[in-house]
A protein has these predicted regions:
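Acyl-donor (CoA/ACP) binding surface of acyl/acetyltransferases
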Residues: 1-17, 21, 57, 61-148
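An amphipathic alpha-helix signature
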Residues: 12-19, 39, 43, 47
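Hydrophobic residues in alpha-helical segments
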Residues: 22, 31, 49-50
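Structural motif
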Residues: 25-26, 53
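Conserved GNAT-fold acetyl-CoA-binding loop/helix
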Residues: 26-45
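Juxtamembrane/interface motifs at transmembrane-helix termini
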Residues: 37-41, 49-51, 89
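Alpha-helix boundary/capping detector
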Residues: 44-48, 69-72
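A short helix-loop-beta-strand connector motif used in the catalytic cores of GNAT acetyltransferases and
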Residues: 47-59
Length: 148
């Protein structure tokens, strides 16, 4: 079988798998909000995400199976903050690097990421993609990548 990756925008029908990933123990440890999320809260979040013109959530599919998400939040005209989640069963398989590479390949501007300093897999991945550390504050590393 040929390996096929597809990065697409999230739809309302993706809510269940996204909630499973969001409430995963390791995802919550690495998130800035580590609270469990209810079905009602999550469905409302997805609905608001889809209608927010300054926020877009993408899902990466591998052979049509959802394996990760990347969210962009527009801060300025050419500046986006990125955050991402990998399916628990696909962690450690370079999915994050593939997903970020597919996302960044045809984009221009400044891209920011905030990563907890203890999240070494994420730090290693974004540094490999060329993100540079520009600030540290309260155990959070701030990274930036400029693409022109």
């Amino acid at each position: 079988m040929r390996k096929s990756f597809n990065l697409r925008e999230v739809t309302k029908s993706d809510w269940k798998v996204l909630l499973e990933w969001r409430n995963d123990k390791i995802t919550r440890q690495n998130s800035f909000n580590s609270d469990l999320v209810s079905v009602r809260e999550h469905k409302e979040y997805i609905k608001n995400m889809i209608t927010n013109p300054n926020r877009t959530l993408f899902i990466l599919e591998y052979n049509e199976i959802p394996v990760g998400t990347i969210r962009e939040d527009r801060l300025e005209k050419d500046e986006l903050e990125l955050s991402y989640t990998i399916s628990p069963i696909y962690r450690g398989k370079k999915i994050g690097q593939i997903m970020m590479s597919l996302y960044l390949i045809e984009r221009k501007g400044s891209f920011l990421c905030e990563v907890k300093e203890e999240n070494s897999p994420s730090i290693k991945m974004i540094e490999k993609l060329g993100f540079k550390l520009f600030n540290k504050e309260k155990r959070v590393n701030f990274y930036k990548l400029n693409l022109s």
